[in-house]
């Protein structure tokens, strides 16, 4: 199958950007390091203190930024494909808010138990998506109705989350408040279980379903004529996208706008929707890693939650996108 040079170059540039910013993030911080020291630490040849800084403190954060960004980018690409709407994303429709509601319930009931938090995030995201799906169902799914109902459910969940925080202990409320902003601070290898493996499984599932997604983009009638079970395929894709969002939320809190922005930027860079999930994964990973680097370095020695940076940049992009859509109409 012929692939355009622009598509290949854009994917290679995104991958190179991830590598460059990842390496810079490993070097930067309160203890500046050289590239040679990074390589030695990764190979186990560096002094113990440098190895500790690189492999236990900085490397998990960099890798999780890449993985979470990829998960959000793929999730956003799936939602925009299913909705056939540039505003179709899990954060706009409230699915990451539902996952965050699950996290809050788990934190209030079980404390910071990682498995309970991951499972509760999954449950919250999936239950929210099913409620939105059922309320929007009228002999099929209409995109506009689905998005409007999702926005309404999101508003209700925000109120519920505020009430939960008021009922929680002071320590839990402070921890949840930082997490609610979306933060990669303090991520270690131990805290990646079980959410990180789940993201990898769901990314694999998304890759296996990409053919169905492309056929659905041709229209329900065409997809059905080609042997695709339309509603079943749409539900499977939505569950994969919601699971990716929920697992990312369990790791770092509800990080907004990556899922919305990454697919748009990926399509503009390559000029095509082919390899859409791959492009969106690379773009989401690059955006979140760059945002986290800014969050760490802009106000040193203080660190911002990465969600503050993504909301600031994503809000500007959303305004531009809405203006462009209104001009088209």
Q: What is each stretch, according to the model?
A:
Residues 1-329:
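Alpha-helical transmembrane segments in inner-membrane proteins
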